[in-house]
UniProtKB/Swiss-Prot annotation:
Reaction(s) catalysed by this chain's protein: Co(I)-[corrinoid Fe-S protein] + acetyl-CoA + H(+) = methyl-Co(III)-[corrinoid Fe-S protein] + CO + CoA
Protein name, per record: Acetyl-CoA decarbonylase/synthase complex subunit beta 2
Function: Part of a complex that catalyzes the reversible cleavage of acetyl-CoA, allowing growth on acetate as sole source of carbon and energy. The alpha-epsilon complex generates CO from CO(2), while the beta subunit (this protein) combines the CO with CoA and a methyl group to form acetyl-CoA. The methyl group, which is incorporated into acetyl-CoA, is transferred to the beta subunit by a corrinoid iron-sulfur protein (the gamma-delta complex).
Name of the coding gene: cdhC2
Gene Ontology terms, MF aspect: acetyltransferase activity; anaerobic carbon-monoxide dehydrogenase activity; CO-methylating acetyl-CoA synthase activity; iron ion binding; iron-sulfur cluster binding; nickel cation binding
Alphabetical UniProt keywords: Acyltransferase, Iron, Iron-sulfur, Metal-binding, Methanogenesis, Nickel, Transferase
């Protein structure tokens, strides 16, 4: 569009601004990043106004990272507070329509980059602000008036962040007494499909969106005012499994929106057909097989988990709209759900959290589990985690003894089978065994590799066993 110094089109969704092509970074893991939408009476809004508090783009140094907050005020006859989260989540959409401007995450985790090419064409955030507001009013016509304030001053961003956190907390509390079984309709969201094409985000009363920005009430409000938008109703259909949270209606939508890649999603399962993970999730869950437990790491945590991996590495393994068994992306508010990974033990399966996350969700953790979940202050690796869990008598420790007994029983069974099979392989005197191709086998006592699969699902379409012939 000629009135703006950069191109605007949905084709730029998914565009990444790499570090080498970046002019400045706003928010992200090295600083503070915030976006917030507030509904206001129309007489309190100056339509189209852009205010900048702190250094403008022309005052910034190339390659630097700056704190960032975007506060949008919106008004209209149909605009109400219930729509704030819905409008807010579209910020991600519309900013990514702008060429050379990358936007990731949401709420208090915003991460943006302005490319060198785009920065060379504009010296202020004002045209950027006007472009985003133009897109909002075009795509969401119920918004009649809109203004925005950009904050790049550290003290001001900190102030806005503190106020916003209270607003987010109040929003999240609305679904506390509403549960999956109380409603007939869930809601879906496809906002992240530009980055994760097969992601199917399902929002139920007991499961907030992966980004944490959309709860069940937000989905309902969005589908009502924008029926053709990215949030839509899902008839939950027949309850197939109450423990895992499997519904026929969700499975149908999963198959359709993933183009057939997935045929089921179980809302409260960690291992079996888990919810897909996009890339905007607030927390990554990861299985630790050595202790048969699950750890969780949040986006803000900069250290390493006991498995030796950080958030960014595990997020790369988890995201992309896939079902990755052993990893799971979630929104922070899901920790407060009474159905939190209930198919796989719930809080009794959680063994590790970063201390900052543990403090943040303290009210969600059952009292009898608080001192049994380790943090980076307690353990540094798998061995120290094992020791900690034993000392605290964590529920997963009871599973270790059961697993050891299973392994012993399996070994005994293998020995019995081998002993029974041995006489059968000895030919009777004078009897000539027919010649058969030799097939080398490995036994537990003769070296080689032993593989033990537990709770594994293996599908083999076809197996061919043939004799390996020596080359002459």
């Amino acid at each position: 569009m000629s009135e703006f110094p950069f191109e605007i089109s949905p084709m730029f969704e998914g565009e990444r601004v790499r570090k080498e092509g970046m002019f400045v970074e706003l928010g992200g893991p090295k600083s503070l990043g915030l976006e917030l939408v507030r509904a206001k009476p129309m007489d309190e809004i100056e339509d189209g106004k852009v205010t900048i508090v702190g250094p403008d783009l022309k005052d910034m140094e190339e390659g630097k990272t700056y704190p960032w907050a975007m506060i949008f005020h919106v008004g209209g006859e149909l605009v109400e507070p219930d729509l704030e989260s819905v409008i807010e989540r579209r910020v991600h959409d519309f900013i990514n329509y702008c060429q050379g401007i990358m936007h990731l995450n949401q709420r208090y985790d915003v991460w943006m980059r302005i490319s060198k090419d785009t920065a060379a064409k504009m010296d202020s955030f004002e045209p950027f602000g006007k472009a985003v507001m133009m897109l909002f009013k075009t795509e969401l016509p119920f918004i009649e008036k809109m203004q925005v304030t950009f904050y790049t001053d550290q003290a001001e961003v900190e102030k806005q962040m503190a106020e916003a956190m209270e607003i987010f907390k109040a929003r999240d509390a609305r679904t506390k007494d509403l549960h999956d079984e109380d409603v007939d309709v869930f809601y879906g969201c496809t906002l992240c499909q530009s980055f994760a094409p097969t992601n199917v985000c399902v929002v139920s009363p007991d499961r907030v969106s992966l980004c944490g920005a959309i709860n069940w009430f937000d989905g309902r409000a969005a589908a009502k005012v924008d029926p053709e938008g990215p949030q839509f109703a899902i008839e939950k259909g027949e309850l197939l499994d109450a423990k895992t949270g499997e519904y026929s209606g969700v499975n149908e939508v999963a198959k359709k929106l993933s183009s057939g890649e997935f045929d089921k999603i179980k809302l409260h399962s960690f291992f079996d057909a888990p919810h897909t993970s996009c890339g905007c999730f607030e927390v990554v869950g990861f299985y630790i097989p050595e202790v048969d437990g699950i750890g969780w790491v949040n986006r803000e945590y900069q250290g390493m988990a006991p498995n030796g991996l950080g958030f960014s590495t595990m997020a790369g393994q988890t995201g992309g709209g896939k079902q990755i068994v052993g990893f799971l992306g979630i929104g922070i508010n899901y920790f407060y759900s009474p159905k939190f990974i209930q198919a796989d033990g719930g809080w009794n399966r959680v063994v590790w959290l970063p201390s900052m996350l543990k403090e943040k969700i303290d009210e969600a953790i059952p009292d009898d589990m608080k001192d049994k979940i380790a943090t980076e202050k307690d353990v540094t690796d798998i061995e120290s985690l094992k020791t900690f869990l034993k000392e605290k008598n964590h529920p997963v420790v009871a599973n270790w003894a059961a697993e050891a007994e299973e392994e012993e029983e399996e070994e005994e069974e293998e020995e019995e089978v081998a002993a029974e099979a041995a006489p059968m392989m000895m030919p009777a005197a004078g009897f000539q065994m027919p010649a058969m191709p030799a097939m080398p086998m490995m036994s537990g006592g003769a070296g080689g590799i032993k593989l033990t699969f537990k709770n594994a699902k293996i599908t083999i379409d076809r197996m061919i066993i043939s004799e390996k012939k020596e080359k002459k």
